[in-house]
Every structure is written in structure tokens, then in C-alpha cells.
């Protein structure tokens, strides 16, 4: 028997609710005072329900049976003589089962006014704690609090496994003042799939993944996933304390860039990714043995297209499913720290893809992106550019950076494509871009965002490293923000990389005419805090591997590569090397398969790997190679003009009491005997490293491990020595005692 709708619903409210057009659902559904406070009424909308009883949660007693208003699932009824609100559940009889459902429409808003203010202002650092899907408890009831920013949507519902993806079942509470929609849902389980169903102002319906989801489905599926309640228990206190006390610009920093999906694979055909436990057991010991101080991970935020390598993320807060869950990732970072290895994360804040389930026109308007394509579309990648002028977008990005550093203990972020953020005309022709308020080409909003980001992160997370991939001559990338700089800790030295790799590809006979390509970088080495990077971008898209770039026979290729690494490790600046380069991978990188580890069955590849390992260990052991990386006093040319022989000689200095190191690099196959070099100290010297040693695959030309200085001034030094310079080789020479002071 049906009860007339007008007995419980305002005129037309029932019809609007059934049609999904009643947005202020909390004023209608749930428990409300009626009859001037002399009664309570409960209304609910449960499709396919046969009957509904109201049960007191406190004592489990049935309070009332609701009247069925119509066949579509509207129920309502008064609660006898009760006038004081109480917690209740709905006991719902369906054709095949009975369910107890804690009514979500009986709960007040769980949002905090301070959080809302900071989010709108653009300074929220923990927006992920109230946006997205978070486990909460209110009035003794546990559930998931769903919240999403969609100010221009007409209606937003949360849909998922728990409501059979019915968009009318869980319409969310709208906050008109700030554009947030929320709903606290009991009866939701860990691992439940969900999305947000949005009705745009034009009436269109679109289902979107949660922008703040911390877990997502495997592509091609794109549902968000309710996270687990259990959290990783950290054991890296010693590392975090050490990190906070370390001045990284004065410390050795040698990063191994890794694409987790192709470093190594498993399965009979190499078709399976390693999971985080595999990586703990295999990658960490390898990196430790090779002497790298850090791992830099290419992006691991969820991304649908493997070929993007992670640089087109859709789930910025969700660690990709490919290698395990969030707790697995935390365990991996924890294990890195316990092994004494830092871990940097590639972070994509310059753009986002147009996947329809993602951020694009999220609420029917250009919410996260600029509306004008001259500012909102990236022409190179056909992606969208964040609107850095919008407070909520800044909070979304700032909170995401904090999320990875706070919740996952990453030791820093490497920001991708910073140049594209800094300039409004980046990759655009005249007429395709809009000038800033002063008529210039600088993106003032993006610059301001980067300054705030770096300032906030360095303040909140002591000892982190913020690294910029920035390829232009933009001034002050690593200057502090109070000096009008961007505030990064380090900047990739793209100029050094391009020049040195170009030199590497020259025939040794003609390198004398391009000598400046290896010396020019010292003209600007102290204008920024540079990191020398040979990244994935240099060994892909037809560029070939490093070994492939080098002319000559195999012996010359391997010898040149070893000498090049010697020059790189001796040059001022921190280091980054892409995986596979450390053993001389022959093929260019392929993200769809493992590195060619079988090459290590061959001695030349073993030699390059051993050389890199020894360089790294020397780099960590000798302060001269890092403590004055960004001070002119830390480097001195002995001879930068010997283009005829293509030989480069220089000294690296540490602080008082640190042994200086002399580098001699020969970039031709010519052996030089009786070659005189200046030395900073008198006495005996030790040949610390010789890339031409037989153990590295060389011809064993050198100085038998020792060099003796004589009192003959040379190259501006009070003493010198005659040495043998091996072909295509690198020598690293230092005082045998290691303690005397240089002139």
C-alpha cells in the first residue's frame, strides 16, 4: 500500500529527487524535525527495496517501519513519540536479501573551516586528508568520507561497488561557498571501487576518477579504489635524522635514474614487472654495491599509457598499480633508507593529459586548466597546462608534493619540464600565446607557484632535494626565494649534457676542433647549483645508447665511455646517470623490456660497470669531489687549452686537510709518455684510478699506481711530474698521504 508523497515531501521534491534534480538532498533525506519540533521524520531513497525499518544503533531496537511512498524506492515515516535525534540504521528488505545500512544522510558535514580556507587560498599542504576518500569516524561510526571539488557541477554523486553504480543513491552534500561536495559513507569496505558522477550545468552526465584517489584500477579500467586502513610502520628514523643534518650541496650525490617497469623483469618471457618486494631484494643491493647515493624514480603516479613512461599521470596521488600498493612502495622507500640510499621522485606538475576520466573539464568547465588554449594547452604533447593562478589548483599540487614527501618519505622531487612552466611562449609561434600583465613572456603565476612550493617544502621537510629539469638560461633557478630565485636546490645542467654528448660523438681525430665543448661548462658552472645529468631522454627516440653514439671499434667505444664518465665524475656538480648506462648498454632504452643484463657476461661491459662502481666509491670517499662543488675554490684547470692532444687536466680541491685530486683525461687513442703535469703538493702521489687498467678492460698503460712530484714549476704549480697518459683514458691522482695542504 502506497502513502501519498505530499504527506512527507514538499511539493515536487519527490519527483525532483527521483529524476536526480534535487541537489540539496540533506535538507530532504535523513532524519529531520517535523510538526514544529514535536516529531521526527526519516526519509530515504532505496531502489528495489520492499520495506525499510528504522533501528536504533544504541540499543538495536526497531523504532518504526517507514511507509513506501512509491515503487521507485522512496520511503518515509514519523518515529512515534521520539523528538530527540538519535543514531540509526535502516534495515532494508530486498527481494533476495536483507541489509542493515547506516543512513549517511543523518551525519553533519565533516569539513573543517580552516582546511576549506587554506584550500581556496592555495596554501593547503594536506588537502588529501579531507579531499578524496578518507577513513573517518564520527559519533562512533566508522566510514569513508568522500569529498571532491567541483564548483560548477549541478549535482555530484559518489558511485561504486557499494551502490551498484547508481548515481541517485548517494548524492553528495554541496557547499556553494567553496565548490566542495562531500558525503560520509558507512558500510564501505577497503578495496571498494568508486568514481564521482557529475551532472554538468548543461545537463550532461560524466563519470570521473577521483582526482585525490590514493589507489586506482589497472588500465584500461579507471575506477578509484578505497584505500586500506593499515599503514606501513616506518623504520628509517636514523636516515631521516641524518638527512635533515646533511647539507647536500656539499655532500656527494650520485643518482641512479630508474624506470621501475624496465630495469629488470621476471617471467619466462620477461613479461612481468618486478614488484616492490622484488625491488627491495634486487635493486637496492645493486645500487648499494655500485656506490650510488640516491635512486631517482621516473614518475610512479598512476598513468594509463605505458608509453608515456609516467609523464602523463591521471592519478597524481595514486602510486601506480604496476608494482604493488602504497604500503609496498613505502616498504621499498624504507628499505632504501635503511640501506643508506636516498630516493628522489620525478614529479609532473607542468601538465596533465586529456583522458576523459581525468581532470579535463572536470565539472563541465576548465577547472584545473586554463580556458584559453593559448595558456591551457601544451602544443608539444597535446596535454593541458595547470591554471597556477587558481588557489585550489595550487593547493592540489602543493598538497600532492607534500603527500609524497610526508606519507612516503621521499627525499626530494625532480620537477619535469620546468622550462615549459616558466615561459608563456614555450614551443609557441607568435600569435599563439598571451603575454603576462606586464607584456612579457614569463609565466608569473607559475613562477610564483614554484617559489611557494620550494619555500614550503624546504621548510616542512628538512634535508630534501628539489631538482629542476630546466633547459633555458632562466636566471636564479637555484637562488633562494628571498633573493628572487625559484628556490630549487639543484638544476640539471642541460648545456653540459648537450655539449659533452656532442663531443662524445665526434671522431677522435676531429675532437681537437671541438675542445671547447668540454671546457665551456666551467665558464658558467657556478651560476647555478648544477647536477650533471645523463638521463633517459638521451638514450631513446632514435638517439641510441651512449655506446652507440661513440665512433670507432669496440675497444675505442668502451675506452671513450670510461674516460667520459671519469670527466663527468671529476667535473663540479652532482651526478645523475640513467640505468643501463653504467654497464654500457648497446641498444637504446626500450620501456617494454628489461635492460640487457646478459651483456654482463662479456668483459668490456663488466669493465665499464666496475669503473663506474669505483668512481662512485671514490666520489663518496674523497671530499674534494663534492664539498666545494659550487665554489670556485673547488676547481682549477691545469690545462684547458691542449686541444691538439685533446687532453684535459684539472684539480679538485676540498677544504683544509682534504686531499686534492688531479684528473687527466685523454680523449684520443694516442698514448702519451713523459707527459708533464703540474701538481698541487710536493711528495708522493697515488694513482687512485686508471680507466685503462686491465680490470676495466683497458690496455694497462699507466703509472704503476704511483707518481712522484719533483720541484719543477709547471702549469701554475710549484711542482710537477712526468706521467704516462693512457689512450682514451682517465687518471685520478692524489697525494699518497692525503692530508697535506695545497699551495
Swiss-Prot record:
Keywords: Carbohydrate metabolism, Glycogen biosynthesis, Glycogen metabolism, Glycosyltransferase, Transferase
Assigned EC number: 2.4.1.18
Annotated catalytic residues: 416 (nucleophile), 469 (proton donor)
Gene Ontology CC: one annotated term: cytosol
Origin species: Shewanella baltica (strain OS155 / ATCC BAA-1091)
Family the UniProt entry places it in: Belongs to the glycosyl hydrolase 13 family. GlgB subfamily.
Catalytic activity as recorded in UniProt: Transfers a segment of a (1->4)-alpha-D-glucan chain to a primary hydroxy group in a similar glucan chain
Annotated protein name in UniProt: 1,4-alpha-glucan branching enzyme GlgB
PANTHER family cross-referenced by the UniProt entry: 1,4-ALPHA-GLUCAN-BRANCHING ENZYME
Amino acid at each position: 500500500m502506497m502513502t501519498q508523497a505530499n504527506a512527507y515531501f514538499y511539493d515536487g521534491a519527490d519527483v525532483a529527487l527521483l529524476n536526480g534534480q534535487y541537489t540539496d538532498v540533506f535538507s530532504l533525506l535523513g532524519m529531520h524535525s517535523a510538526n514544529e519540533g514535536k516529531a521526527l521524520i526519516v526519509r530515504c531513497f532505496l531502489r528495489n527495496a520492499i520495506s525499510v525499518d528504522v533501528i536504533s544503533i544504541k540499543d538495536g531496537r526497531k523504532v518504526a517501519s517507514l511507509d513506501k511512498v512509491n515503487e521507485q524506492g522512496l520511503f518515509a515515516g514519523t518515529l512515534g513519540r521520539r523528538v530527540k535525534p538519535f543514531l540509526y540504521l535502516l534495515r532494508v528488505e530486498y527481494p533476495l536479501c536483507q541489509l542493515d545500512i547506516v543512513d549517511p544522510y543523518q551525519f553533519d558535514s565533516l569539513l573543517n573551516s580552516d582546511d576549506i580556507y587554506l584550500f581556496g587560498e592555495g596554501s593547503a599542504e594536506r588537502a588529501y586528508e579531507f579531499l578524496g576518500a578518507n577513513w573517518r569516524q564520527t559519533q562512533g561510526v566508522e566510514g569513508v568520507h568522500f569529498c571532491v571539488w567541483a564548483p560548477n557541477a549541478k549535482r555530484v554523486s559518489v558511485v561504486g561497488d557499494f551502490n551498484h553504480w547508481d548515481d541517485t543513491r548517494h548524492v553528495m552534500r554541496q557547499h556553494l561557498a567553496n565548490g566542495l561536495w562531500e558525503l560520509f559513507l558507512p558500510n564501505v569496505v577497503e578495496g571498494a571501487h568508486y568514481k564521482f558522477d557529475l551532472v554538468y550545468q548543461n545537463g550532461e552526465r560524466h563519470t570521473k576518477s577521483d582526482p585525490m584517489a590514493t589507489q586506482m584500477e589497472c588500465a584500461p579500467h579507471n575506477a578509484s579504489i578505497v584505500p586500506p586502513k593499515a599503514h606501513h610502520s616506518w623504520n628509517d628514523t636514523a636516515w631521516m635524522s641524518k638527512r635533515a643534518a646533511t647539507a647536500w650541496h656539499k655532500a656527494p650525490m650520485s643518482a641512479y635514474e630508474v624506470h621501475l617497469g624496465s630495469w629488470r623483469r621476471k617471467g619466462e618471457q620477461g613479461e612481468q614487472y618486478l614488484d616492490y618486494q622484488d625491488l627491495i631484494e634486487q635493486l637496492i643491493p645493486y645500487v648499494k654495491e655500485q656506490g650510488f647515493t640516491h635512486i631517482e624514480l621516473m614518475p610512479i603516479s598512476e598513468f594509463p599509457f605505458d608509453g608515456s613512461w609516467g609523464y602523463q599521470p591521471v592519478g597524481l596521488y595514486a602510486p601506480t598499480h604496476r608494482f604493488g600498493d602504497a604500503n609496498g612502495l613505502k616498504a621499498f622507500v624504507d628499505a632504501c633508507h635503511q640501506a643508506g640510499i636516498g630516493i628522489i621522485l620525478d614529479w609532473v606538475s607542468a601538465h596533465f593529459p586529456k583522458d576523459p576520466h581525468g581532470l579535463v573539464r572536470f565539472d563541465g568547465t576548465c577547472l584545473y586548466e586554463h580556458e584559453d588554449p593559448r595558456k591551457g594547452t601544451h602544443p608539444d604533447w597535446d596535454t593541458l597546462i595547470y591554471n597556477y593562478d587558481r588557489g585550489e589548483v595550487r593547493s592540489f599540487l602543493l598538497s600532492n608534493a607534500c603527500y609524497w614527501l610526508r606519507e612516503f618519505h621521499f627525499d626530494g622531487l625532480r620537477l619535469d619540464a620546468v622550462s615549459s612552466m616558466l615561459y608563456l611562449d614555450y614551443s609557441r609561434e607568435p600569435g599563439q600565446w598571451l603575454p603576462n600583465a606586464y607584456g612579457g613572456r614569463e609565466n608569473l603565476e607559475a613562477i610564483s607557484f614554484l617559489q611557494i612550493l620550494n619555500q614550503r617544502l624546504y621548510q616542512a621537510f628538512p634535508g630534501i632535494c628539489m631538482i629542476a629539469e630546466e633547459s633555458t638560461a632562466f636566471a636564479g633557478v637555484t637562488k633562494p626565494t628571498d633573493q628572487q630565485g625559484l628556490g630549487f636546490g639543484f638544476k640539471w645542467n642541460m648545456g653540459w649534457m648537450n655539449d659533452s654528448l656532442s663531443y662524445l660523438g665526434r671522431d677522435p681525430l676531429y675532437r681537437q676542433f671541438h675542445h671547447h665543448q668540454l671546457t665551456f661548462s666551467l665558464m658558467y658552472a657556478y651560476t647555478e647549483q648544477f647536477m650533471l645529468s645523463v638521463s633517459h631522454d638521451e638514450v631513446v627516440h632514435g638517439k641510441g645508447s651512449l655506446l652507440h653514439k661513440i665512433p670507432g671499434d669496440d675497444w675505442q667505444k668502451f675506452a671513450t665511455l670510461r674516460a667520459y664518465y671519469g670527466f663527468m665524475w671529476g667535473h663540479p656538480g652532482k651526478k645523475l646517470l640513467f640505468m643501463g648506462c653504467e654497464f654500457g648498454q648497446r641498444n637504446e632504452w626500450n620501456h617494454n623490456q628489461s635492460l640487457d643484463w646478459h651483456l654482463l657476461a662479456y668483459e668490456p661491459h663488466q669493465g665499464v660497470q666496475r669503473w663506474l662502481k669505483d668512481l662512485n666509491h671514490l666520489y663518496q670517499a674523497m671530499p674534494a669531489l663534492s664539498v666545494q662543488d659550487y665554489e670556485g675554490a673547488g676547481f682549477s684547470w691545469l690545462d684547458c687549452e691542449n686541444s691538439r692532444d685533446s687532453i684535459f687536466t684539472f684539480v679538485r680541491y676540498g677544504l683544509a686537510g682534504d686531499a686534492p685530486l688531479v684528473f687527466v683525461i685523454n680523449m684520443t687513442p694516442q698514448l702519451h709518455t713523459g707527459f708533464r703535469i703540474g701538481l698541487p703538493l710536493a711528495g708522493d702521489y697515488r694513482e687512485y684510478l686508471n680507466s685503462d687498467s686491465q680490470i676495466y678492460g683497458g690496455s694497462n698503460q699507466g703509472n704503476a699506481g704511483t707518481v712522484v712530484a719533483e720541484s719543477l714549476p709547471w702549469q701554475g704549480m710549484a711542482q710537477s711530474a712526468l706521467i704516462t697518459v693512457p689512450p682514451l683514458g682517465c687518471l685520478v691522482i692524489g697525494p699518497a698521504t692525503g692530508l697535506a695542504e695545497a699551495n
